[in-house]
């Protein structure tokens, strides 16, 4: 949890926080008020925080949401930090949080998507984190290309995506929805993902972790509006989504942009 012992008026603060729902990423604590977000993002952060050193590096978080991971990255001493997310509400959440957790104003927040990266930030970053974005893209290869071209030579990509458990070079393409999400297009096997990354030009593809999503990590709270994981799974068989697909399984990976291609 990110904690800030500020002297703000708790009542006014809580009103501001609730007006910014739903809070997907967190948790945060400000003036003893806990923002109990839908996702316990510390679980994911613990899996990727030591993937590569961030000290004195130029770092990006693509799909940064409200900035939770950016604030955690500050603790590792990067040279600079840029977050990318086109969402309007999550930027408002970031603007609310930044005075508490980025008092030196080191973070740049860009309202841009992954498709904008290579044009606006070519060969710019030593490290890019892209967590929970790839399966939302209609063209995952184009998204990987954009990430590749935004990295410096010998830059590293830390990637998290939904995956399917299969030894084959295949991807699940949900017919209409996956776990009630309409914007999920391709969920690859690890082997298929490795092939995509290598076709784009990445090398040294490394599996950091594979983890099932559980109610400990994603659940309904008073700080979101609507449903969460428990509502997306089959009540009689939680190993399946409501649509009959395998329940969410996430892979965490690291790869390198080589010096020559």
Swiss-Prot record:
Annotated keywords: Transferase, tRNA processing
GO molecular function terms listed in the Swiss-Prot or TrEMBL record: methyltransferase activity; transferase activity, transferring alkyl or aryl (other than methyl) groups
InterPro entries: CmoB, Mo5U34_MeTrfas-like, SAM-dependent_MTases_sf
GO biological processes: tRNA wobble uridine modification
EC number(s) from the headed UniProt entry: 2.5.1.-
Disulfide cysteine pairs (residue numbers): none
Binding locations of carboxy-S-adenosyl-L-methionine: 25, 39, 44, 63, 114-115, 135, 250
Residue stretches spanning the membrane: none
Any Pfam family hit: Methyltransf_9
Reactions performed catalytically: carboxy-S-adenosyl-L-methionine + 5-hydroxyuridine(34) in tRNA = 5-carboxymethoxyuridine(34) in tRNA + S-adenosyl-L-homocysteine + H(+)
Domain of life: Bacteria
Function as written in the Swiss-Prot or TrEMBL entry: Catalyzes carboxymethyl transfer from carboxy-S-adenosyl-L-methionine (Cx-SAM) to 5-hydroxyuridine (ho5U) to form 5-carboxymethoxyuridine (cmo5U) at position 34 in tRNAs.
NCBIfam families: PRK15068.1, tRNA 5-methoxyuridine(34)/uridine 5-oxyacetic acid(34) synthase CmoB
Subunit structure: Homotetramer.
Family as reported in the entry's similarity comment: Belongs to the class I-like SAM-binding methyltransferase superfamily. CmoB family.
Protein name: tRNA U34 carboxymethyltransferase
Gene: cmoB
């Amino acid at each position: 949890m990110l904690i800030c012992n500020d002297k703000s008026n708790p009542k006014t603060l809580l009103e501001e926080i609730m007006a910014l729902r739903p809070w997907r990423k967190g948790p945060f604590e400000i003036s003893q008020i806990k923002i109990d977000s839908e996702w316990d993002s510390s679980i994911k952060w613990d899996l990727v925080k030591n993937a590569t050193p961030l000290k004195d590096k130029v770092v990006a978080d693509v799909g940064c949401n409200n900035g939770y991971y950016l604030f955690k990255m500050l603790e590792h001493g990067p040279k600079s930090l840029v977050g990318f997310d086109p969402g309007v509400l999550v930027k408002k959440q970031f603007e609310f949080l930044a005075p508490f957790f980025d008092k030196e104003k080191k973070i740049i927040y860009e309202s841009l998507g992954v498709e904008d990266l290579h044009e606006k930030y070519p060969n710019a970053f030593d490290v890019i984190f892209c967590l929970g974005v790839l399966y939302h893209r209609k063209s995952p290869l184009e998204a990987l290309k954009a990430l590749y071209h935004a990295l410096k030579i010998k830059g590293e990509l830390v990637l998290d995506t939904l995956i399917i458990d299969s030894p084959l070079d295949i991807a699940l393409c949900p017919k209409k929805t996956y776990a009630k999400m309409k914007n999920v297009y391709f969920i690859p096997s690890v082997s298929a993902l490795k092939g995509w990354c290598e076709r784009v030009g990445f090398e040294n593809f490394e599996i950091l972790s594979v983890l099932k999503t559980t109610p400990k990590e994603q659940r309904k709270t008073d700080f979101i509006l609507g449903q969460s994981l428990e509502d997306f799974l089959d009540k009689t068989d939680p190993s399946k989504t409501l649509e009959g697909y395998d329940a969410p399984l996430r892979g965490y990976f690291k790869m390198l942009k080589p010096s020559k291609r």
